[in-house]
Amino acid sequence: MKLLEIKGLTARYNAGDVLKGLDLTVHEGEIVALLGSNGAGKSTTLRAISGLVPHVGGSVSFAGQQILGRKTEAIVKLGIAHVPEGRRLFPGLTVRDNILLGASNRKRVRRAELERQADEMLDFFPDLKRLEHSYCWSLSGGQMQMVAVARGLMAQPRLLLLDEPSLGLAPLIVQQVFRIVSRIRDRGTTVLLVEQNANVALSVADRGYVLEAGALMVSGRPDELWSNPQVRAAYLGGLATA
């Protein structure tokens, strides 16, 4: 079933066109990776889905509803959570309190139920339970990434947008983060991610889209992308930039 369908998506900033008629589909239960060089439009795609890009055109349909042009708050309520690059946690709040902020759109849910769900998030992510009362300024980069993803999941999204979840992390921590991404899909959440590490991204993704200068270059299963000589040479030889 198509959960997200993008047709002819355009986005423009002052410097010019960032997205130039992008088509993209995400089926329910998938992990889909957006790959490509720096400035290709990957992060802008996630921001456009989330209602964070003002000058957009085309069509973005989520669960059969047109969402392009809606406010971010309305998009979150429909079931889309966006974990941006840089994590953007509140350093003066504890791990637990940062996670609970992810449920700010669920005002009708009782506090006791939200606390129970926060407990589930703390148990789901390695190491977070013992850190629940620690302030986020004291965490490592990997721990902060886990908190950011847990906060996104507190919104109970059908679609989780992850923008460069491995940014600035050591290789062993990156592997841990992507094991969590696989587990997130296994618990029923669809994932669309932007990633600079093609090896790791395609190890968990069902399909990938390679963008170039704001347009789709090629898409396919990981094995299809790896077997494409042009794509492999240009973008998948380690994919040093995003």
Per-region residue spans from a language model:
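Helix-to-loop junction immediately C-terminal to a conserved catalytic motif
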Residues: 50
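ABC-type ATPase nucleotide-binding domains, specifically the catalytic core motifs of the NBD
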Residues: 14, 70, 95-116, 124-126, ...
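ABC ATPase C-loop
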Residues: 152-153
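Conserved catalytic motifs of ABC-family nucleotide-binding domains
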Residues: 156
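Conserved ABC transporter NBD signature motif
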Residues: 58-67, 78, 112-118
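Conserved ABC ATPase signature
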Residues: 135-139
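The feature captures the beta-strand-to-loop junction immediately N-terminal to the Walker
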Residues: 35-37
